[in-house]
């Protein structure tokens, strides 16, 4: 009888804790999978239900792409660019400087097809590794609005950009998830 009561109590506490964590964080860790690239030295969590996309023939520097199986225009990508090996992220400027430079590069390269607006730029330090979180609103083509959240850092002479993208009208729905996923990105 005592064992049955104890087992029931453990199950109830576990369920209550999982509901509480999901309600507080908006995303249960069980709903995320880990991706690790040991060659380039980075890893991140991505949502269950997202699948890898073949990047053969993609733009230079695109290392990996995942997209949602259902919301097909929600995706994440990792883009790697070479930089001098002695450069750190802070050598490239503040989060706002780097964010504006990315925005200008996108806007200049798109020939009017894509216009990005920097909404927010923040820096975070994890054990001496600096990351910039950059948030953009992007207007694509004929008034298609998108929302991007990027985490940027340097590692081994490379600038690594981890970017999540969704339709603007889905942003409020996925913001908590995207924040969790972007924060999970780190290099080693």
Swiss-Prot record:
Positions of N-palmitoyl cysteine lipidation: 24
Lipid positions (S-diacylglycerol cysteine): 24
GO cellular component, one term: photosystem II oxygen evolving complex
Single Gene Ontology BP annotation: photosynthesis
PROSITE patterns registered for this protein in UniProt: PROKAR_LIPOPROTEIN
Keyword terms of this UniProt record: Lipoprotein, Membrane, Palmitate, Photosynthesis, Photosystem II, Signal, Thylakoid
PANTHER family per the UniProt record, alphabetical: PSBP DOMAIN-CONTAINING PROTEIN 7, CHLOROPLASTIC, PTHR31407
NCBIfam families reported in the protein's UniProt record: PSII_PsbP
Protein's job: Plays a role in the early stages of photosystem II (PSII) assembly; binds to D2 (psbD) and may facilitate its incorporation into PSII. Required for optimal photoautotrophic growth in the absence of Ca(2+) or Cl(-), functions in optimizing PSII water oxidation/O(2) evolving activity. Might be involved in assembly of the oxygen evolving complex.
UniProt name for this protein: CyanoP
Organism, as annotated: Synechocystis sp. (strain ATCC 27184 / PCC 6803 / Kazusa)
């Amino acid at each position: 009888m005592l064992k049955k009561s104890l087992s029931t109590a453990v199950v109830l506490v576990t369920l209550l804790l999982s509901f509480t964590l999901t309600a507080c964080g908006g995303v249960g860790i069980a709903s995320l999978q880990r991706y690790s690239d040991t060659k380039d030295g980075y890893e991140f969590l991505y949502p269950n239900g997202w699948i890898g996309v073949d990047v053969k023939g993609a733009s230079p520097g695109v290392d990996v792409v995942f997209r949602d199986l259902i919301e097909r225009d929600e995706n994440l990508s990792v883009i790697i660019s070479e930089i001098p090996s002695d450069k750190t992220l802070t050598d490239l400027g503040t989060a706002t400087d780097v964010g504006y430079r990315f925005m200008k590069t996108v806007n200049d390269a798109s020939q009017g097809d894509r216009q990005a607006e920097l909404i927010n730029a923040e820096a975070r330090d994890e054990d001496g590794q600096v990351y910039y979180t950059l948030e953009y609103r992007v207007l694509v083509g004929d008034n298609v609005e998108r929302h991007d959240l990027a985490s940027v850092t340097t590692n081994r002479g490379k600038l690594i950009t981890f970017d999540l993208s969704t339709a603007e009208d889905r942003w409020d729905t996925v913001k908590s998830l995207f924040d969790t996923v972007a924060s999970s990105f780190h290099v080693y």
